[in-house]
Structure formats: structure tokens, C-alpha cells
A protein has these predicted regions:
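Canonical P-loop GTPase G-domain recognition
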Residues: 149-213
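Conserved beta-strand segments of the P-loop GTPase G domain that flank and frequently precede/overlap
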Residues: 77-79, 104-109, 141-144, 183-184
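Conserved nucleotide-binding/hydrolysis micro-motifs of P-loop NTPases
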Residues: 20, 83-84, 111-113, 145-149, ...
Length: 227
């Protein structure tokens, strides 16, 4: 989070995932939704898209959005290039010293034949986040391309999250921050859960800072500060 003297707050949200999982398409669809419909979050300016002729992200995509209810709250939104050779750039975008990541949307290519590639991308994210996922950085999962055949379902991916210790059991105080898993389609004409997933991520990013001072707040933390 970056707080300026004029009271404006900038939160950074990163779409992360393997190459061709649909991150750029999601951002473009989110931009259209928030520009064309009355939503709690609106785009500011145009998207910055840096891509190859094939449409694959070359370095990153970036957009700026603003809360309509809390007008001094802004969201800097990035997508990262998912190809293996861009690991150093992904790390730089995620961990930029003066603008560190406040929340992550992990985008899964839901086709079952890409399961290992998705897990590899998740492991890289875990490593770069250095054990901060969920504890300090909220994460949402989008099982994208659900309009295709032979896709991963929610329970399959929940098992992966449990294996990677990115899922809390009910007795843990941070159970309320388990990643919500959305089954999505990024294509504008078939869009599903594009805005909902972003809105929830933005909500969690704010709650972590307001009630947890940059960490996952417990229900007691929230209760004490709302009394």
C-alpha cells in the first residue's frame, strides 16, 4: 500500500498465472465491465498493454481503477508475463520496493492437461511471496477457461492449495481468509465472475490494511475495531 500526503491510498493487485491462462483477457474484460456498467470500482484512463504479435504478454499489463465509494482509494492492477523466461521480471513486479503487492489473483488455465504448469506457477508465487500469502497478502483463485471441456474443478484445486499449505482448517483463526475459488470465463461475450473476483480481492486488500495493519485480521480484530 502507498499512502500519499493528500490522503490518497494506492493498493496493488497482481494477476498471476502460467502463460496463456487468460490474465490479459481478464484485465481487458474487467476494464470494459467497469467502464460500461455502474460498479463500485471504475477505470481511470486507459489500460497499458505490452504484448507480442501473438497476443501473449511481453512484459506486463497495467491499469488503474478507483473506488466510487471511497474516492481516495485506488487500485494499481498488473498482469505478469507467464512464460518461464520472465521469472526475474515477475519477481520485480511483485516485490517492487516502493509499491509491494497487496493482493494476488491466481489465474488457472483450467484444462486438465495444464495442471502441472499451473502448480509450477503457484510454487513460484509461493517462493517469491516468501510465506506471506494469506498471512499478509490475500489471494483469490480463478479457474479460468471453464467454457472448455475437460477442466479442473474447485475440489481438485482445493486439494492442491491444501498440499501447498495455502488453505486453513476451520479451527484456525485465519480460516475466513481461505482463497475463494471462482470458476470463470474471461471472454467478454461469455464473461463469468470477472468483476466479482476482482471486487472480492479489492475488499480483502482493504480489510487487511484497515483491520490487520497489513496482515490477515482475525474476526476478533475486526470486531474490536468496529465497536
Amino acid at each position: 500500500m502507498v499512502l500519499y500526503k493528500d490522503g490518497k491510498i494506492y493498493l496493488k493487485i497482481v494477476y498471476w498465472g502460467m502463460g496463456a491462462s487468460g490474465k490479459s483477457t481478464i484485465l481487458k474484460t474487467l476494464y470494459r465491465i467497469t467502464k460500461e456498467s455502474k460498479k463500485d470500482i471504475i477505470p481511470i484512463g486507459e489500460l497499458q498493454i505490452i504484448e507480442k504479435a501473438s497476443g501473449a504478454t511481453l512484459y506486463f499489463d497495467r491499469g488503474l481503477f478507483q473506488s466510487t465509494k471511497q474516492k481516495k482509494v485506488y487500485y494499481r492492477v498488473y498482469t505478469v508475463a507467464g512464460q518461464r523466461g520472465f521469472t526475474p521480471l515477475r519477481k520485480k513486479i511483485f516485490d517492487k520496493t516502493d509499491d509491494q503487492t497487496d493482493a494476488v489473483i491466481f489465474v488457472v488455465d483450467s484444462r486438465t492437461n495444464f495442471l502441472e504448469d499451473n502448480v509450477e506457477s503457484l510454487l513460484e508465487l509461493k517462493n517469491i511471496a516468501n510465506d506471506r500469502l494469506l498471512k499478509e497478502i490475500p489471494m483469490i483463485v480463478m479457474l479460468n477457461k471453464q467454457d472448455l471441456d475437460d477442466v479442473i474443478d474447485e475440489e481438485d484445486f482445493k486439494l492442491i492449495l491444501k498440499d501447498e499449505k495455502l488453505w486453513y482448517e476451520p479451527e484456525n483463526k485465519l480460516y475466513i481468509w481461505n482463497p475463494l475459488i471462482y470458476t470463470s470465463c474471461a471472454l467478454y461475450d461469455q464473461k463469468k465472475d470477472i468483476y466479482r473476483s476482482f471486487h472480492e480481492t479489492a475488499r480483502r486488500a482493504v480489510l487487511y490494511h484497515v483491520y490487520g495493519e497489513g496482515k490477515a485480521p482475525t474476526e476478533m480484530d475486526i470486531s474490536q475495531k468496529t465497536q
